[in-house]
Amino acid sequence: MTKTIAVIGVTGAQVRYLSALLTDKHTERSQGGSVANKFLSLGWNVRGITRSATSDSAKAQAAKGISIVEADLDSTSTLIPAFSGAHVIFAVTDFWQPFWESNARLSKISDRATGEHCYAIEVQRGKNIVDAIQRVLKEEGTLERFIFSTLPGFKEQSKGKYTYVYHFDSKAEITKYLKSKDELWSRSSLLNMTFYSSNIMRFWPLTKVSRLLFPLGFVVDRCCYSPRTVIDT
């Protein structure tokens, strides 16, 4: 029997939206898309979950053999049939699309307004995903693994020192909610992808020093080691 993986984030809308704003170009690279493409190459049935099956990116994924299913992360009832029958579910939630859609307006209110707004949206959508999967697991029992792309909570780990890192704290809050669902949590794995290497080429153009050397600067403590593994997405 060929197994099925359902992938949220298959069209990479969050990456394309930001890229379009800053460079007026779109990209087909995304975390969800890379997962879908990999499992497709392994012979799995891949179900791509997206808001619009008629978008150009959704059509491009469908042309590869990915089954595109429409669902709304703001509506648990639309997610349940999208997850039904899947053996594996991969989900990445989106902080940045609502951020760039609302920042020009909300940043005039306060320096926290946009972050708080997007935090609330992402957390609720993450909880909707968890609730829908929990429902499918209880009714069908066929789910083998749920993989959630998350991040550590800055506020918690800094003991309240850093409170502005909303895009980390939102995913950490979703993870906390997931852990409260005992049966689902026992079948869950967490993936921490703190930074996409593809963003380097998109937002920090590199200057070539030699044939193999492209310096890239990040501000870190001098005592801090910051190893980076390049993964093709």
Task: List the predicted regions and their residue ranges.
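Oxidoreductase cofactor-interface core, primarily capturing Rossmann-like NAD(P)-dependent enzymes
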Residues: 2-59, 74-76, 95-106, 113-119, ...
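Conserved Rossmann-fold cofactor-binding substructure of NAD(P)-dependent oxidoreductases
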Residues: 53-88
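Generic alpha-helical scaffold signal
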Residues: 62, 83, 120-123, 127, ...
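Fungal eukaryote-biased detector of long internal structured cores
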Residues: 78, 121, 128-144
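Alpha-helical repeat scaffolds in large eukaryotic proteins
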Residues: 87, 134, 154-156
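Periplasmic-binding protein-like
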Residues: 90-93
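Short-chain dehydrogenase/reductase
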Residues: 126, 130, 175-178
